[in-house]
Amino acid sequence: MAPPETGDELVFFVNGKKVVEKDVDPETTLLTYLRRKLGLCGTKLGCGEGGCGACTVMISKYDPFQKKILHHTANACLFPICALHHVAVTTVEGIGNTKSRLHPAQERIAKSHGSQCGFCTPGIVMSMYTLLRNKPKPKMEDIEDAFQGNLCRCTGYRPILEGYRTFAVDSNCCGKAANGTGCCHSKGENSMNGGCCGGKANGPGCCMNEKENVTMMSSSLFDSSEFQPLDPTQEPIFPPELMTQRNKEQKQVCFKGERVMWIQPTTLQELVALKSQYPNAKLVVGNTEVGIEMRLKNMLYPVILAPAWIPEMNAVQQTETGITFGAACTLSSVEEVLRKAVAELPSYKTEIFQAALEQLRWFAGPQIRNVAALGGNIMTASPISDLNPVLMASGSKLTLISMEGKRTVMMDEKFFTGYRKTIVKPEEVLLSVEIPYSKEGEYFSAFKQAYRREDDIAIVTCGMRVLFQHGTSRVQEVKLSYGGMAPTTILALKTCRELAGRDWNEKLLQDACRLLAGEMDLSPSAPGGMVEFRRTLTLSFFFKFYLTVLQKLSKDQNGPNNLCEPVPPNYISATELFHKDPIASTQLFQEVPRGQLVEDTVGRPLVHLSAAKQACGEAVYCDDIPHYENELYLTLVTSTQAHAKILSIDASEAQSVPGFVCFVSAKDVPGSNITGIANDETVFAEDVVTCVGHIIGAVIADTQEHSRRAAKAVKIKYEELKPIVTIQEAIEQQSFIKPIKRIKKGDVNKGFEESDHILEGEMHIGGQEHFYLETHCTLAVPKGEDGEMELFVSTQNLMKTQEFTASALGVPSNRIVVRVKRMGGGFGGKETRNTILTTVVAVAAFKTGRPVRCMLDRDEDMLISGGRHPFLGRYKVGFMKNGKIKSLEVSYYSNGGNSADLSHGVMDRALLHLDNSYNIPNVSIMGFICKTNLSSNTAFRGFGGPQGMMIAECWMSDLARKCGLPPEEVRKINLYHEGDLTHFNQKLEGFTLRRCWDECLSSSNYHARKKLIEEFNKQNRWKKRGMCIIPTKFGISFTVPFLNQAGALVHVYTDGSVLLTHGGTEMGQGLHTKMIQVASRSLGIPTSKIYISETSTNTVPNTSPTAASVSADINGMAVHNACQTILKRLEPIKQSNLKGSWEDWIKTAYENCISLSATGFYRIPDVGYNFETNKGKPFHYFSYGVACSEVEIDCLTGDHKNIRTDIVMDVGTSLNPAIDIGQIEGAFVQGIGLFTMEELRYSPEGNLYTRGPGMYKIPAFGDIPTEFYVSLLRDCPNSKAIYSSKAVGEPPLFLSASVFYAIKDAIYSAREDSGVTEPFRLDSPATPERIRNACVDTFTKMCPSAEPGTFKPWSVRA
């Protein structure tokens, strides 16, 4: 049946309302339609590739085959609008709102402090809501599994899980608050105990609470009894019209767009005929692969066929030989069928099913599994597919159909013919897949190693099957299939042939590994890199398979018990997977003093004031601002070369794209093209580009889609120049950004002479992508007169945004108004680098005279905006036999990228934190900023401090080994004391670190657990545990003195309501909430009377960036100052009417012509430091903390599990314990990413490979410590900040180094088992590759690395 000349009508429902779309473009995603056409902006764009879950919605449809309504989550960023025909969509706006009532899924995440920046919150809410629709009484495991496809960069996940635990039927496991104080999960060796009162030190029930004038400790951040109950009967009904429609006979529909035609046939005959007519058409079910190809790889498929309605392609049939799945069956439905089969069939028949289920468990996230088809997974022919090795090793059969009829092919070594190619003919359709039952005497396993367990693509994956001759341990047949070892999924044919007929014993293992090492060879330059690691994994996986089978053979009652060797007891754990235990956590904080007024919220765990709006999708972010009628969209044109001369720019082809308006470049800048913190950057590149992603121009068009297409059509010719990419290359070529900083204290040479030992070494710390969920966004609105322009920007730095824009436009700063309501995360990434986008958008708005908007796609944002500086530290440390440090000489090298930006400040802080928390009498340090051809690196939470301290802990760890002393003892004897001078000669006052250290040692039960770890390691050869306790000392202040200032503006209106404005921006850290708490106490009124609308340059001028963790300090003092001014004016009125209310006093003041508006100002006194003289005071005060972490590693794969973390943190007298604990946990988990997971990978030519969540992995829900305990140090007021508080944003991040060094501790145990005892180098992050390669053993020795310099690597370390 040929498609009609005109398109059909698309009919679907959104939040219960019918939508009829007569003009639909198949290239439009559901996300775009929701946001642009329906104005439903609660659904967010986080990545555009289905990797973050910010766009999660619920899809509901009536299944006529099962005769029931099905609800499932999906990623709206990939879901094609055309796939919604006769489907219902529910978005976060459709389940509850702040005007009427919140749904329990919204209320609980808000009130449990699970929303910080809030950008990810709607997606998480919808994942929870969909789970509740399907399972109103879920288990905790169901809840954790539901979030596999959701990411959060702010919270550290713990409060989200705690809030949603209240839905779980197994939450109250022992009749008490689950995992709170007194829960059974918190008892025993792993409880947060120690110290006084039988393990209740510092907590509720501690003897300290009985003392006079001592406030109590609390572990309750929210009261679950206040939550409204879930009532499943009150959920919206499924549209009856859709049930009626699906029961009717369906007809083929067709939708035509500008470039793509979408045809949805209803019968197999129609589909086969269409595939014959359009042999190159793509079949799409979930669009999870094709959608990414079209957006990120610039692919175009003019015809798309959607087989989702065809009964035969959705059918599931159990036969005598296996289960046959229609090719359009989703992975979730396959999972459901296999799980049922495993539960019902004899276990010997389900070996393959069990392995497939294990692979499916970690296959993407639920949002992808719910829509992605089994057939699509096969036909995509990805060489790193999780399922294809299972299907190949199992001997699965595929049925193909075309106009010529059906044929069945085996999924064997002949099926994949090349990269992304199969034997399937263009006109053929994959109809079904048969996964066979396993036989008696047949065993099957599947393995996968990735950077992250949840929602990650494989590095290497495999399926392994062995069939034994009946009644023996002799191999009849073996199939070993690998992904990630070639351009296709492959079988180790030679190895399989050699193993047939052999007995399953140690000799077979040795020969198999030798054969695999030869057969699974890789070129040192192989795409994907990690060659040594990948080769070793092939052997490690087989070893695991060998042990697993051996174990099953010996346990099989009917098997040849006497014919196989038993598995050695210390090897058994190698066969066990890391399992997920329910999270256990406690948060301890000091309650407010007895007698504090109820309306005084300072010190109370007040919920983030935007949390409810964020949970309902009502909070407005930059790209949520309604579109102007004449608005245009901008897409950047960036360099594809790291270093090159621009020979020509040709935008002529772009002009032919529909909707094209203009192209802007350097010649269109009306003011100065020079920009940047150090005036060493340009708005647009002119003659030379100095990094991939360097902005050359921009295309402006009527829609985002048109501007994207036009931007891709711009042609640029280059003359390539040699780039500098790595720190090592910069050192060799002496490419440094001057000046080079130094600090000297004492006599280093004399210190070395007096030392018993001298240790030299180096450590590299990789960079880190900010991965704020909201990418950079700007909306520029020209006002039409005198060069005025209004900018809505996602920025931490209004002043520089205003200044740089004014410079580019050639107008004074007073013509530019910058507004920021909130950001979807920042972490330093929006302190300066937003300006490279904002100035471009402003120039475009100036040229066109119309509003212009741009929100970067995730891949663009990661490419151009820079991140945390990679560091190399080279050290020489002298120390005594007892571990006491005498002398330190260090050189730090950072990779600054192609401009200075904030690199000097980052290096300054690194130099000032080289000591971490240790008193070193003699110090000499130099800091070099490498100028390279990468996008300029910039501020990131910690701002150089974590890198400086990480290198300190590297030599501290190694010297403890050298001395043969416990690391915790060596660390403690080197800790500062009260009154000591740092290496930059600042006196330590109010030094609480030793209190934090002692309490953390006690509460973590450190010494008892250390003995248990030693015992565990003796009993396990291939799994090892490690533990480490790490301190931190973090200086608080901008190191640029003039930035330590802030302003505020307070307006009081005649009804008594207060409008508060200050110079800080809200990015999820709760700054606005804290400022309202400060104003509330200062004015003596409830927080409900105070409101913050936004931060803007026309209310508070010359604002310092919201950075350096000082924003609450400086803005809080400025707010307090403004409030005190108003109170002083009100004092006479209050005295004359002592019984009056606030409203009475305000009305009287107004009638007496007393100003009810006041500005406030504050500057930090007496800060400033001179590197030349090593004199001054760079910091106002210090924040302190200690963390103890325990991990377990898999020595065979490099995988690791975070078992437990205890943190004790000094935050002074907390302004808001919930926000402060949230910052501690969020920073810690972000640090886990920095030190164990997140790795930026570049080509030798400087091209960034890791441009999205597909290849760049931040921690997910399953990566946080299973036991996570945080305690705020009690009774430690800080006289130097507002209401005795302390900064909290950055200081906790470095504590996650405890995880890194716990991993290193575990690796030491593995190496000792191999007879290797000397200190070793472990660079950061401790990825599975580095962990596995460091656990030297027989397998690693069989896969040696190629000699550096003899090959060109696929990737380099910047």
Curated annotation (Swiss-Prot):
GO CC terms in record: cytosol; extracellular space; peroxisome
Annotated [2Fe-2S] cluster 2 binding sites: C117, C120, C152, C154
Pfam families assigned: Ald_Xan_dh_C, CO_deh_flav_C, FAD_binding_5, Fer2, Fer2_2, MoCoBD_1, MoCoBD_2
Tissue: Detected in liver (at protein level).
Residues annotated to bind FAD: 283-290, 363, 373-377, 386, 430, 448
Catalytic activity reported: xanthine + NAD(+) + H2O = urate + NADH + H(+); hypoxanthine + NAD(+) + H2O = xanthine + NADH + H(+); xanthine + O2 + H2O = urate + H2O2
Keywords, ordered alphabetically: 2Fe-2S, Cytoplasm, FAD, Flavoprotein, Iron, Iron-sulfur, Metal-binding, Molybdenum, NAD, Oxidoreductase, Peroxisome
Record domain 2Fe-2S ferredoxin-type: where: 8-95
Xref: InterPro entries: 2Fe-2S-bd (IPR002888), 2Fe-2S-bd_dom_sf (IPR036884), 2Fe-2S_ferredoxin-like_sf (IPR036010), 2Fe-2S_ferredoxin-type (IPR001041), 2Fe2S_fd_BS (IPR006058), Ald_Oxase/Xan_DH_a/b (IPR000674), Ald_Oxase/Xan_DH_a/b_sf (IPR036856), Ald_Oxase/xanthine_DH-like (IPR016208)
Binding site for Mo-molybdopterin: Q796, F827, R941, A1108
Cofactor note as given: Binds 1 Mo-molybdopterin (Mo-MPT) cofactor per subunit. Binds 2 [2Fe-2S] clusters per subunit.
GO biological process: urate biosynthetic process; xanthine catabolic process
GO molecular function: 2 iron, 2 sulfur cluster binding; FAD binding; flavin adenine dinucleotide binding; hypoxanthine dehydrogenase activity; iron ion binding; molybdenum ion binding; molybdopterin cofactor binding; xanthine dehydrogenase activity
Enzyme Commission identifier(s): 1.17.1.4, 1.17.3.2
Binding site for [2Fe-2S] cluster 1: C47, C52, C55, C77
Subunit structure: Homodimer.
Function: Key enzyme in purine degradation. Catalyzes the oxidation of hypoxanthine to xanthine. Catalyzes the oxidation of xanthine to uric acid. Contributes to the generation of reactive oxygen species.
Protein name in UniProt: Xanthine dehydrogenase/oxidase
The species this protein was found in: Gallus gallus
Gene transcribed to yield this protein: XDH
